[in-house]
Amino acid sequence: MVEDKIRLLIVEGRSHSGISDELLRGATQAIEARGADYDVITVSNALQIPTVIAMAEDAGHRPVGVRYDGYVALGVVIRGETYHFELVANETARGLQDLGVAKRLPIGFGVLAVDEEAQALSRARVSEGDRGGAAAKACLETIGLKRQLLGQAR
């Protein structure tokens, strides 16, 4: 039996362009190195990512929808002077974890929650932390485990 080619959806919260570019570059390089296909949906902030992944997963079960094997969540949340940072960072992580567990979705977590922009850049750069690439690799690994443990492709 020939295994289907892996197809991922990257959902990126693009609130900090330079950092987002690096996260996306790392993720796409890792996916392409594996020979997988991917689509990208861009939203304005990290808090939207779990909702969009849930909608994409639901759409994939309709006749006209695209079925994805897994998802890569990319975004940046930088601490400010208010409680907003904690709300966005914590609820984004919680929403993604809830989706992954409840629906058994492979989701690579590449949402950076940092104190300052310099920290985000060093973690996002492909030549340094490559958190985008790490998120994509984690998703691909989880897809392999899902296929092994549950015998499921899409």
From Swiss-Prot:
Q: Which GO biological-process labels does this protein carry?
A: riboflavin biosynthetic process
InterPro entries according to UniProt: LS, LS/RS, LS/RS_sf
Which residues take part in binding (2S)-2-hydroxy-3-oxobutyl phosphate?
Answer: E81, T82, R123
Could you tell me which Pfam families the record lists for this protein? DMRL_synthase
Q: What is this protein called?
A: 6,7-dimethyl-8-ribityllumazine synthase 2
Catalytic residues identified in the record: H84 (proton donor)
Catalysed reaction equations from the record: (2S)-2-hydroxy-3-oxobutyl phosphate + 5-amino-6-(D-ribitylamino)uracil = 6,7-dimethyl-8-(1-D-ribityl)lumazine + phosphate + 2 H2O + H(+)
| Binding residues for 5-amino-6-(D-ribitylamino)uracil | A46, L47, Q48, V76, V77, I78, F109
- Key words of the record: Riboflavin biosynthesis, Transferase
A molecular function (GO) term: 6,7-dimethyl-8-ribityllumazine synthase activity
The source organism is: Caulobacter vibrioides (strain ATCC 19089 / CIP 103742 / CB 15)
What GO cellular component entries does it have? Answer: cytosol; riboflavin synthase complex
Primary role: Catalyzes the formation of 6,7-dimethyl-8-ribityllumazine by condensation of 5-amino-6-(D-ribitylamino)uracil with 3,4-dihydroxy-2-butanone 4-phosphate. This is the penultimate step in the biosynthesis of riboflavin.
What's the top EC group for this one? transferase
Biological pathway: Cofactor biosynthesis; riboflavin biosynthesis; riboflavin from 2-hydroxy-3-oxobutyl phosphate and 5-amino-6-(D-ribitylamino)uracil: step 1/2
- Does this entry carry the keyword Transferase? yes
* Assigned protein family: Belongs to the DMRL synthase family.
